[in-house]
């Protein structure tokens, strides 16, 4: 296995969450073993782009992946954590760089090792230096560079590592169990906090996502643009943001293509999943489906109708079992043309 040093940084949203998630995802690969993690640091941004401070750390990993294979997997991890490459040296949810790959010197079109900017970046070298033994090939050059950069205007200081979201949820669930009169240490509840944390990771998986990108567009004969494309009875499950109780039901989604652009049929259910897997209300889910579909497809019109049962209505309060809430939202021709709107509604009967 090859010893490799990675530098990681984040300056958007919950920075430590993205760093923890990146470490977790890297460690799940069967050919990567996380050996050491540095302290967490806060650093001022470089590169001249106005943005928030970064949280940085370094990893020492052992890997069986070749350098370009490792780079490809790193890009997959970054993409899964909502990394967008819009501004060079700009803000990002996560940035992972290969700094050293053993003692190798690599000159590829998309990979240079040692990283070409490493010896100019205090936030790269200082965390990595924590992880090195003094027989490492670049130990002395790194030590000398740190001494020089420490006299520059680059700001860097150690910060406290925060608890992971999983640990926070587990501790909160234990407190809730105490508060309702339970004993979280009794046999039936010992693993409940961990189960709840894992459940929230699944059912609120869109909570930190800002863009829907699980789709592909296709072209068809533009003469068929007036035909309505409808997918109905799409199941969804979500969590009410008012009481954190489930609500669930079916979504019916239609659009009228424009310019021959259509979206893969399976992507509309994926869109419904995306908007529903976070704390929300039914009205927002209805609008979000229509707005996102309009943004990515630019159709002539979009129609969405959502039917839902709400546990905050059925389990508590008024306790009206089996009551059904319907919400609808129309854009473009569905909003302006009553015949098109009626065609959509009649197709649901």
Curated annotation (Swiss-Prot):
Kinase keyword on record: yes
This enzyme's EC code(s): 2.7.6.3, 3.5.4.16
Spell out the molecular function terms from Gene Ontology: 2-amino-4-hydroxy-6-hydroxymethyldihydropteridine diphosphokinase activity; ATP binding; GTP binding; GTP cyclohydrolase I activity; kinase activity; zinc ion binding
Q: In which pathway does it act?
A: Cofactor biosynthesis; 7,8-dihydroneopterin triphosphate biosynthesis; 7,8-dihydroneopterin triphosphate from GTP: step 1/1; Cofactor biosynthesis; tetrahydrofolate biosynthesis; 2-amino-4-hydroxy-6-hydroxymethyl-7,8-dihydropteridine diphosphate from 7,8-dihydroneopterin triphosphate: step 4/4
Positions of the UniProt region annotated as 2-amino-4-hydroxy-6-hydroxymethyldihydropteridine pyrophosphokinase? 1-226
Q: Name the catalysed reactions.
A: 6-hydroxymethyl-7,8-dihydropterin + ATP = (7,8-dihydropterin-6-yl)methyl diphosphate + AMP + H(+); GTP + H2O = 7,8-dihydroneopterin 3'-triphosphate + formate + H(+)
Region: GTP cyclohydrolase 1, residue numbers: 226-349
The alphabetical list of record keywords is: ATP-binding, Folate biosynthesis, GTP-binding, Hydrolase, Kinase, Multifunctional enzyme, Nucleotide-binding, One-carbon metabolism, Transferase
One GO BP annotation of this record: tetrahydrobiopterin biosynthetic process
A Pfam family matched in the record? HPPK
Q: GO cellular component terms? A: cytoplasm
What Gene3D superfamilies does this protein's entry cite?
1.10.286.10, 3.30.1130.10, 7,8-Dihydro-6-hydroxymethylpterin-pyrophosphokinase HPPK
**Sorted alphabetically, which HAMAP family does this protein's record hold?**
FolE
Subunit relationships: Homomer.
Entries under PANTHER family matching the protein: GTP CYCLOHYDROLASE 1, GTP CYCLOHYDROLASE I
Family, similarity comment: In the N-terminal section; belongs to the HPPK family. In the C-terminal section; belongs to the GTP cyclohydrolase I family.
| UniProt name for this protein | Bifunctional protein FolKE
Question: Which gene is the coding source of this polypeptide chain?
Answer: folKE
């Amino acid at each position: 296995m090859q010893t490799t040093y990675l530098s990681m940084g984040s300056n958007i949203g919950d920075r430590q969450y993205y760093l923890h998630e990146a470490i977790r995802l890297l460690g799940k690969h069967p050919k990567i073993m996380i050996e050491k993690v540095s302290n967490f640091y806060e650093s001022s941004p470089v590169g001249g782009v106005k943005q928030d401070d970064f949280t940085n750390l370094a990893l020492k990993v052992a890997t069986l992946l070749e350098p370009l294979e490792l780079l490809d997997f790193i890009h997959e991890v970054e993409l899964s954590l909502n990394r967008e490459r819009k501004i060079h040296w700009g803000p990002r949810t996560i940035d992972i760089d290969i700094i050293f790959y053993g003692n190798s010197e690599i000159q590829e079109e998309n990979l240079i090792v040692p990283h070409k900017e490493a010896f100019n970046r205090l936030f790269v070298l200082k965390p990595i230096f924590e992880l090195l033994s003094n027989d490492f090939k670049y130990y002395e050059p790194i030590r000398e560079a740190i001494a020089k950069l420490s006299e520059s205007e680059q700001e860097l200081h150690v910060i406290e590592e925060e608890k992971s979201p999983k640990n926070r949820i587990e501790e909160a669930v234990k407190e809730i169990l105490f508060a309702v009169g339970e004993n979280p240490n009794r046999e039936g509840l010992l693993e409940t906090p961990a189960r709840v944390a894992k459940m929230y990771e699944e059912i609120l998986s869109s909570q930190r996502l800002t863009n829907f990108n699980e789709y592909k567009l296709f072209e068809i004969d533009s003469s068929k643009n007036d035909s309505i494309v409808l997918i109905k009875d799409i199941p969804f499950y979500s969590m009410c943001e008012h009481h954190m109780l489930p609500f669930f039901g079916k979504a019916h989604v239609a659009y009228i293509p424009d310019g021959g652009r259509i979206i893969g049929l399976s992507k509309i259910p994926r869109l419904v999943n995306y908007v529903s897997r976070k704390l929300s209300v039914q009205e927002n889910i209805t609008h979000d489906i229509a707005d996102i579909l309009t943004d990515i497809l630019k159709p002539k019109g979009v129609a969405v109708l959502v039917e839902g049962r709400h546990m905050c209505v059925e389990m508590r309060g008024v306790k009206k079992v089996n009551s059904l809430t319907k919400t609808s939202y129309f854009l473009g021709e569905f909003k302006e043309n009553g015949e098109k709107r009626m065609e959509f509604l009649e197709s649901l009967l």
